[in-house]
């Protein structure tokens, strides 16, 4: 069964290593009810008979589960059948084409069986694991976070990436655990953190605030006044209503150059909606200020159109043209899974193209400035994508070389649950390395945007583009042109809000954050980080 963990492990691990089939032992998931207990007991006995587990490799779920030991699991639990938590099932819905198809029960190795392993390594990556990683490592041992039981093991290692480790004290606020090597970004991070702790704006922070919150080290070389003013100015200078640079204006302390006054701008959008979701206000501002703006949609996004949406458009066409495709409509009516059907994928891709054109026309750029790249790595017809090839890089390289942009905007939002953003960014970085020696690239600046899944931290921001209430509404309307991505989205991630709601909430939250630390009061703000190459 392609939706079983037998299949998952085979595709993602066993097919890549030289393991013998007879050395693979996975609990059976197709047993009758009266067979389960006996099977679980024999499974544990088999482990014992073979001398126990020398090395155990684990993942961790957002509930803190290891294996399928959900919150509330007993410290001495053995292999058994368990009821799956809603969050666990919701996280698996992509693989099962909807939560309604995800099993409600599973067989799991127990906590006692796991902790008997001589060596344990737990892997985690991604922003959505950061909160539970902090609880598992730093909080008290708690059965509601089963991974926290590993604190009692004498030989365990957590292997984490930057995102999953971001909430750990040693990463988020390292000044609380020891001396720091202070750079400008870390200093800004500390001061903004202090504002949060004290509920004060930057210019109201006192020497006592620093001393009482583990930040006295900052006062060794600067006064409180000097630090406050330095960080205040740093953040204030990120704010601009001119994302393409303000013409004929002194730009020493502005995030973008004033010249050339009219720039060629290239926005890379991994899916056909990320541009307006993540930087719709800035996109609109660049166009209204007279820059030559191009958008390049890197993938077709075709698998993100539901069969019911494709069917709707097919039926409209059939009614208009008096042409019928009974086989196609039958397939669409009676399947709710992703279909590897070239005709369906082509229709879905066209739907997303026309939605994109609706949005870009609303913003005000000509159709000739809209480029559908259809990168080949994406066109597998399934959630699993191909490894990017030279063809993907060539397509990206060609569009950059053709436009010769002064600005490139790229999605740096790596919390995308199905990884397309990361793949597109990796392709871009490879292309950038090959192109950076070109003469036109000497005048090109690269800006990374976020917003679809999470936002830049304030201390990371290099450019902040405020929006008025009217601009917030225009951005919302641009997003609404992507109708198939508005309701019942195929790849929602862990956030059940609609994309326009979540990005608007983030833009409003950033504006509030700026207001709280003493910056002007804006309706909303989009943020960017400059990538130096």
Description of each model-found segment:
Residues 447-466, 470, 499-515, 524:
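PAPS-dependent sulfotransferase catalytic core
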Residues 2-193:
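Conserved phosphate- and dinucleotide-binding cores of soluble alpha/beta proteins
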């Amino acid at each position: 069964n392609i939706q079983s963990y037998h299949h998952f492990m085979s595709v993602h691990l066993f097919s890549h290593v030289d393991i013998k089939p007879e050395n693979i032992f996975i609990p059976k998931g197709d047993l009758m009810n009266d067979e389960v207990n006996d099977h679980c007991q024999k499974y544990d006995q088999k482990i014992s008979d073979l001398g126990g587990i020398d090395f155990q490799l684990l993942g961790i779920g957002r509930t803190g589960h290891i294996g399928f030991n959900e919150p509330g699991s007993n410290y001495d639990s053995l292999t058994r059948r368990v009821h799956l938590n809603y969050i666990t099932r919701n996280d698996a819905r992509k693989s099962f084409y909807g939560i309604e198809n995800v099993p409600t029960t599973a067989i799991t190795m127990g906590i006692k069986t796991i902790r008997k392993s001589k060596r344990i390594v737990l892997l985690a990556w991604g922003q959505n694991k950061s909160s539970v990683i902090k609880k598992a490592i730093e909080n008290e041992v708690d059965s509601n976070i089963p991974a926290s039981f590993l604190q009692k093991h004498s030989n365990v290692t957590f292997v984490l990436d930057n995102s999953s480790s971001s909430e750990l004290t040693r990463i988020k606020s390292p000044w609380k655990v020891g001396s720091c090597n202070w750079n400008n970004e870390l200093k800004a991070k500390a001061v903004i953190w202090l504002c949060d702790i004290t509920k004060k704006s930057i210019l109201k922070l006192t020497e006592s605030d620093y001393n009482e919150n583990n930040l006295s080290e900052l006062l060794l070389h600067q006064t409180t006044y000097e630090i406050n003013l330095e960080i205040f100015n740093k953040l204030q200078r990120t704010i601009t209503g001119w994302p393409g640079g303000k013409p004929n204006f002194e730009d020493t302390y502005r995030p973008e150059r004033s010249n050339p006054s009219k720039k060629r701008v290239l926005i890379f959008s991994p899916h056909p909606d990320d541009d307006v979701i993540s930087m719709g206000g800035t996109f609109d501002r660049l166009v209204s200020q007279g820059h030559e703006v191009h958008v390049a949609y890197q993938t077709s996004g075709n698998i993100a159109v539901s069969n019911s949406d494709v069917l709707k458009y097919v039926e409209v066409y059939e009614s208009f043209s008096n042409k019928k495709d009974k086989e196609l409509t039958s397939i669409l009516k009676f399947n709710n899974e992703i279909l590897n059907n070239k005709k369906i994928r082509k229709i879905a891709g066209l739907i997303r193209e026309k939605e994109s054109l609706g949005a870009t026309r609303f913003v005000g750029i000509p159709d000739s400035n809209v480029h559908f790249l259809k990168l080949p790595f994406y066109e597998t017809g399934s959630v699993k994508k191909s490894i990017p090839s030279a063809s993907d890089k060539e397509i990206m390289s060609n569009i950059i070389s053709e436009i010769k942009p002064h600005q490139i905007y790229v999605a740096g939002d790596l919390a995308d649950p199905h990884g397309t953003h990361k793949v597109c960014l990796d392709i871009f970085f490879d292309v950038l390395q090959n192109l950076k020696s070109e003469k036109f690239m000497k005048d090109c600046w690269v800006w990374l945007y976020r917003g679809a899944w999470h936002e830049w931290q304030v201390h990371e921001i290099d450019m902040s583009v405020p929006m008025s209430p009217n601009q917030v509404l225009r951005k919302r309307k641009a997003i609404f042109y992507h109708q198939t991505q508005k309701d019942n989205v195929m790849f929602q991630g862990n956030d059940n809000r609609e994309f326009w709601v979540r990005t608007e909430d983030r833009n409003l939250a950033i504006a509030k954050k700026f207001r709280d630390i003493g910056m002007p009061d804006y309706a909303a703000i989009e943020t960017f980080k400059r990538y130096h190459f």
